[in-house]
Amino acid sequence: MKSGLLKYALVAFAIFYVCNAQAEQREKPIFPYRLQIGGYGEVVGTYNFFSDEYLRYTDAKSYKDAPGHGRVDIPHFVIWLGYDFGKGWSLGTEVEFEHGGTESAVEIETEEAGEYESEVERGGEVALEQFWIQKSFTRAANLRMGHIIVPVGATNMYHMPTEFFTCYRPEGESTILPCTWHENGISFWGQAGGWRYEALILPGLDSDRFSSQNWIASASGSPYEFKIGNTLAGAFRVDNTSVKGLRLSLSGYAGNSFKNTLAPTESDRYKGVKGTVMIGSFDFCYNAHNLIVRGNFDYGHLTDSYAITKFNMSLRKDSVSPQQTVASDAVAGGIEAGYDIFGAIPSMKGKDQKFYVFGRYEYFDSMFKVAEGLNDSRWCGRQRVATGINYYPMKEIVIKCEYSHGFLDPIYNNEPAISIGVAFAGLFRRNY
């Protein structure tokens, strides 16, 4: 057994060595310049014409005529840095500040007998979204190792604010899937002709952090100083751009989740429970003749959802689990179309400015199917319609305005809102 594994390891090393030598002979830079710095960010202001009380779903009638509420947010600000070491080796990093980052301060409280107190000044997150080392053998064969993006679904692959029309990321995918989904792992990817392909090996999701409203969305990453790796998962993505202006994509994920917890149970009651997560996704983009049309459909299935729900509800109150019912199936689908009015005006053709009028429709339900004996939170399923404008004074900057309306089950109150935002995405400097 050991000798067989050693033999395979030596063969793999030999192949790697030969490919590496060939890449060194070419010595062609991976990036246009050795060092690249870029990023993206967005600021959004929203007024929601519905109550934000936490009981608005359990007691909908009491909040039917409740006043609305406004919010101003910095959903994402990201700094990206890439470096080409040469000989086919490169580095990619991305640091994300969500909702303005986080701040804390220590103060002396005069009303607390002069005691020192630590206070949270700003709520938010700072996260390392990408950190990988890549070896490029050829255009068709690249090996990426480290903290990488999991490109399942449209939004995880195309998540910059210039790649969707709405002020916030598409709500359906970002509700049921981790978004942006980033994880420690290994990725093999490449391009050949009109095809791009990628296969990944990752640690499994953590089933104790599955929830009703967000299904598996909060189960990637880790609340600890390390990522639990008791189970492994696989993911893939295939894109085809053979037709000019059209991209067609398939992606998917499969992996067990139940044992991927800090203290996995050994109880006979849960013997054989795996909590296998399976996700299939199709998305596309058409961009030609002043028209952009994008669409996606995602379907996910979780085995042993009943056992996982019961296990999570039995955990301690101070655990990382939300201790909620978890659905066996979740779904999200959406389509959006935008037309560039400036592109139809002769005097504006050939200029960087664009003015899109768009509409978007989506349906999603994080509790699409629920195992018998579990409560179904029907407010988790909804339709959402949005319409608005995107003005690009230049390619890297966009100003957005949007009206949206969320249509829930008739026993709940609908959720209309208006939003305005400004965003950028691009390289800060190009030559070093």
Task: Please name every model-derived segment.
Residues R71, E98-H99, P178, I228, ...:
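Solvent-exposed loop/turn segments connecting transmembrane beta-strands
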Residues M1-A9:
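Bacterial N-terminal signal peptides that target proteins for export
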Residues L5-L6, C19-Y57, N431-Y432:
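N-terminal periplasmic/intermembrane-space "pro-region" immediately following the signal or transit peptide
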Residues F31-Y33, G45-P75, W215, G221-Y224, ...:
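Surface-exposed strand-loop-strand hairpins of Gram-negative outer-membrane beta-barrel proteins
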Residues A12-N20:
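Hydrophobic h-region of N-terminal signal peptides that target proteins for export
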